[in-house]
């Protein structure tokens, strides 16, 4: 089997990808048997290509799965931890913009009763 390109895999359905994955795994097992029994050098060099192809198929499957989950949870209140933005621990605990702007009743009263003084400069 020739080297598989990820862009060709992205258009396929999940069933097709899983079938291709099974085919690649079967081919890999056959190549490993050939390696043990002393197969040709061309078969031995093909093991690497097949392994990388399996990795590509699995990567595409996982990426599409995660993309679908992102669409599903978009706009929901709670999201799974792996779909939330990866920030530092301190950034996750920081107040958001709305919470930063909130003022206590006492602070609001103080600002209302004692507004900043404005001075007129005589020219």
Curated annotation (Swiss-Prot):
PROSITE patterns: RIBOSOMAL_L29 (PS00579)
Keywords: Cytoplasm, Ribonucleoprotein, Ribosomal protein
Location(s), subcellular: Cytoplasm
Ribosomal protein among keywords: yes
Any one Gene Ontology BP term: translation
UniProt GO cellular component terms: cytosolic large ribosomal subunit
Keyword Ribonucleoprotein found: yes
Region of interest (Disordered), ranges: 84-123
Bias (Basic residues): 86-96
UniProt cross-references to InterPro entries, sorted A to Z: Ribosomal_uL29, Ribosomal_uL29_CS, Ribosomal_uL29_euk, Ribosomal_uL29_sf
Any one GO MF annotation of this record: structural constituent of ribosome
Record note on quaternary structure: Component of the large ribosomal subunit.
Similarity field: Belongs to the universal ribosomal protein uL29 family.
Function description: Component of the large ribosomal subunit. The ribosome is a large ribonucleoprotein complex responsible for the synthesis of proteins in the cell.
HAMAP family (UniProt xref): Ribosomal_uL29
Name of protein: Large ribosomal subunit protein uL29
Organism (species): Ophiophagus hannah (King cobra)
This protein's encoding gene: RPL35
